[in-house]
């Protein structure tokens, strides 16, 4: 009995590490997602592709392109032809940090096995965020991420497909006639 209990405990303790290993693969990762956000009474949704390679994260959908690398973020707003350059403070947490498990501020509360999946409960105390990451038990690949901030903001990300790939065709956009806003200080 003790051996079985210890095995369950050890396997649960590695679930978050398994998730991190999968999405932070040296090959890179391409994730097709459906993204839903509700803020007070307003709800929005979109579908897009998340590219992860080393410390670079890109999210692309029909309305925007977001690239995060080395603490700098570039957002291309396609419908209004606008580019915004900004930097992220070390204390800030991005949605990319949550999706990749790439931040020390993420605290793991529990790991629960449910229907051949593992639900990783987490919180980010400094931002009032609580959430869950659902992963496949076999390989640690994520299937769903849900988090809530202060009851007002809820984000639900369904992962439609995911693959580790050494090469991916990143989208390129001609922004020569776009308005540029530079917020980098």
Regions of interest found by a model, annotated:
Residues 3-43, 53-55, 174-185:
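N-terminal leader/targeting segments and the immediate start of mature chains
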Residues 13-18, 99-110, 156-161:
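A short, amphipathic edge element
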Residues 27, 50-58, 67-73, 114-116, ...:
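Short, solvent-exposed coil/turn segments at beta-strand boundaries
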Residues 33-37, 58-62, 118-125, 144-148:
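Short beta-strand segments that buttress and anchor functional surface loops
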Residues 39-42, 66-67, 125-127, 151:
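Short glycine/serine/proline-enriched coil/turn segments at secondary-structure junctions
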Residues 48-93, 152-154:
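An acidic-aromatic
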Residues 75-132, 140:
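Surface-exposed, polar helix/loop patches in the mature regions of secreted/periplasmic/lumenal proteins
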Residues 114-116, 124-130, 138-185:
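Non-transmembrane domains of secretory- and envelope-associated proteins
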């Amino acid at each position: 009995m003790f051996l079985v209990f210890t095995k369950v405990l050890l396997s649960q303790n590695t679930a978050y590490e398994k998730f991190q290993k999968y999405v932070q693969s040296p090959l890179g990762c391409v994730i097709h997602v459906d993204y839903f956000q509700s803020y007070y009474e307003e709800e929005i949704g979109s579908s897009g592709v998340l590219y992860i390679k080393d410390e670079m994260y890109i999210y692309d959908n029909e309305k925007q392109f977001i690239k995060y690398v080395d603490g700098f973020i570039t957002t291309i707003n396609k419908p209004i032809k606008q580019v915004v350059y900004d930097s992220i403070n070390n204390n800030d947490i991005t949605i990319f940090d949550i999706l990749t498990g790439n931040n020390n501020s993420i605290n793991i509360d529990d790991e629960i096995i449910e229907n051949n999946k593992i639900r990783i409960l987490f919180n980010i105390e400094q931002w009032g965020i609580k959430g869950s990451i659902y992963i496949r038990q076999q390989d640690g690949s994520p299937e769903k991420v849900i988090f809530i901030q202060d009851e007002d903001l809820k984000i639900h990300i369904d992962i439609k497909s995911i693959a580790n790939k050494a090469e991916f065709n990143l989208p390129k956009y001609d922004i020569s006639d776009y308005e540029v806003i530079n917020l980098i200080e």
